[in-house]
């Protein structure tokens, strides 16, 4: 179930303030955030936001196609390191 339209998308206040400040002075800086639940809004297009994945900040360049998605979708938290090819121990 989606969020009510009358409420609007969730964006962390501190993140939105930083984006608006950068847009006012036409600056391009990397913004660090832990707010993976924030929705990407059109004001963020063209900015690079470093989203925390639990270990480090992953830089995410915001494009037009990302609007409406959450920041956390673009910073994977799990790293799959493929199965060992010649592992004979697993099979008996």
Curated annotation (Swiss-Prot):
Coiled coil: none annotated. Disulfide bonds: none annotated. GO terms for molecular function: rRNA binding; structural constituent of ribosome. Keywords: Ribonucleoprotein, Ribosomal protein, RNA-binding, rRNA-binding. One of its GO terms (cellular component) is small ribosomal subunit. One of its GO terms (biological process) is translation. Transmembrane segments: none annotated. HAMAP family: Ribosomal_uS19. Belongs to the universal ribosomal protein uS19 family. Protein S19 forms a complex with S13 that binds strongly to the 16S ribosomal RNA. PANTHER family: RIBOSOMAL PROTEIN S19P FAMILY MEMBER (PTHR11880), SMALL RIBOSOMAL SUBUNIT PROTEIN US19M (PTHR11880:SF8). This is Small ribosomal subunit protein uS19. It comes from Thermosynechococcus vestitus (strain NIES-2133 / IAM M-273 / BP-1).
């Amino acid at each position: 179930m989606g969020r009510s339209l009358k409420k609007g998308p969730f964006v962390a206040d501190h993140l939105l303030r930083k984006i608006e400040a950068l847009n006012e002075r036409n600056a391009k800086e990397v913004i660090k955030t832990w707010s993976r639940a924030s929705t990407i809004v059109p004001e963020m297009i063209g900015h690079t936001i470093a989203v925390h994945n639990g270990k480090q900040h992953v830089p995410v360049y915001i494009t037009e196609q990302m609007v409406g998605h959450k920041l956390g979708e673009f910073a994977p938290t799990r790293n799959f390191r493929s199965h060992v090819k010649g592992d004979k121990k697993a099979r008996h």
